[in-house]
Amino acid sequence: MVTIRLSRGGAKKRPFYQIVVADSRCPRDGRFIERVGFFNPLAAGNAERLRIQLDRVNAWLEKGASLSDRVAALVKEAQKAA
């Protein structure tokens, strides 16, 4: 099953997440199909906190992909801001 989920990057104690489309059997930070955005939970000042390509997310959802709980909340937040 294809899932849209977070893949962790960044340094120790400084997380940065890529929003990726991946096979659910692959490791969290492993192989992915497509990168559709990013999430920076520690963004300060005028740094960008969240960017999602909503058109690509919707395309994958039409193909049968599922959203992780956290990504579903982030997509909802991005749609509200757009």
Swiss-Prot record:
Pfam families according to UniProt: Ribosomal_S16
Q: Which SUPFAM superfamilies match?
A: Ribosomal protein S16
Family assignment from sequence similarity:
Belongs to the bacterial ribosomal protein bS16 family.
Q: Which UniProt keywords apply?
A: Ribonucleoprotein, Ribosomal protein
Q: What highest taxon heads this organism's lineage?
A: Bacteria
The organism is: Mannheimia succiniciproducens (strain KCTC 0769BP / MBEL55E)
Gene Ontology CC terms, in alphabetical order: cytoplasm; small ribosomal subunit
- Name-wise, this protein is Small ribosomal subunit protein bS16
